[in-house]
Amino acid sequence: MKIIQAAVEFAPFIKAGGLGDAVYSLSKALSASHDVEVLLPFYPCIFPTVSSQVIDEKVFAYEFLGRQHASSISYSYEGMILTVITLDSQLELFSTSTIYTQDDTLRFSAFSAAAAAYIQKLNHVDIVHMHDWHTGLLPGLLKEPNRQHYPKRIFTIHNFSYRGYCSTQLLGASGISEFGLSNYQLFRDPQVSVLLKGALYCSDYITTVSPTYAQDILHDYSDYEMHDAIMARRHVFRGILNGIDDNIWNPETDSSLVANYGKNLLDSPEILFTKKEENKVALYEKLGMSPEHSPLLCIISRIVEQKGPEFMKAAILHAMENGYAFILVGKCYDEETQRKFSNLQESLTMSPNVRIILDYNEPLARLLYGAADMLCIPSHFEPCGLTQLIGMRYGTVPLARATGGLADTVTPGINGFTFSHADNFNDFFRMLSQAVTTYRHEPDVWFQLVEEGMLRSSGLSTMAMHYLEIYNSLL
């Protein structure tokens, strides 16, 4: 089967969050038995050099704000084909210092137009699988009746809150037919279109990244036209839980850890916890923290409204009042949040047990997974979440809000702790206190939580199997 995966992130080359990891993991898993090609836009200022073998190069035209020119380079990469598309005559659109900017609907619609033209040049494609609103124009362009090839189209919603509202005139610049364009337009204001809305109507099948989040989407009434769209397509909509790549997230081989360990040490828990303690000591030394504070609770997250920044601050207060260690590693994405957390960071510089690092540093994050006893994910909503899966793999017990994919993967008393209420801190503090008390006074129970998490399947092969079931059902 020839499968195209189209996205604007792909780890490790271009990544801002879990999207890049998810696209890589799925593509890698599918490539074990199928012909998988990943399409990415070229970001001149931030795309790293690809050292893999070049297997093909193309030059082609596409339509977006007139006739444009693009080129592609295809690399052989880990059993897949990685194709990077450069918008040669609109290169300025992607000449930015970050993946996401203020004109993303323009940039990514141009990429979708180029990707559609590229796909039409291929001899045969069975499936085109598109990820998130950024590629929302692509299913509409591939469904055009005048297209020579008509591959089956799968669309995955990674975050329903981001939809790609834009002007209808902008999408019309791609040459899409009036009928195709109507799938994107809002009835209440035809001058406004939504990339995600059109993708829902123009795809053969729609998925999201966990079963519970699929139900959350079906009950989302924030925009009644988006609700109508997903309800109209609910018969071809399901949630498939994301997985992680065990080869990438593996405490046995992770070079960022001072002491490696793995599931093989579950028969010798004292050795396992000694290894984690060695990582903790190294981390404390690195950050200038006092070693006597335990347990260690960490948060590794983007600091945005979705992720519950008010709960992050509350966790700091709880740690200071209860004498355990807390480390936050995360990046702010707006000036106001940056200002607030920078002030908090400065005020805690001399704290013996709390540290805030306002940047995402992967080696540090990996060491934190290996050192921490607990990982907190206090999200208001979470489509799937990968940090809790990584944490469990590293023997770090997740403390999470029971929402979306977190509710599907973290079970209280089995592999972690949860809280439900997002409108007050009482339930959150109850969860934190229960976790700290269990760690300090019930070591056998704590080990069972660690063991259950480390033995949990990564879910990657199951995820790939479910997607293959969908692909095959459409062919």
Curated annotation (Swiss-Prot):
The keyword Transferase applies. InterPro entries: Glyco_trans_1 (IPR001296), GS/SS (IPR011835), Starch_synth_cat_dom (IPR013534). Disulfide bonds: none annotated. Transmembrane segments: none annotated. Its EC number is 2.4.1.21. It is an enzyme of class 2 (transferase). GO terms for molecular function: alpha-1,4-glucan glucosyltransferase (ADP-glucose donor) activity; alpha-1,4-glucan glucosyltransferase (UDP-glucose donor) activity. GO terms for biological process: glycogen biosynthetic process. CDD domains: GT5_Glycogen_synthase_DULL1-like (cd03791). Synthesizes alpha-1,4-glucan chains using ADP-glucose. HAMAP family: Glycogen_synth. NCBIfam families: glgA, PRK00654.2-3. Belongs to the glycosyltransferase 1 family. Bacterial/plant glycogen synthase subfamily. This is Glycogen synthase. It comes from Chlamydia felis (strain Fe/C-56). The gene is glgA.
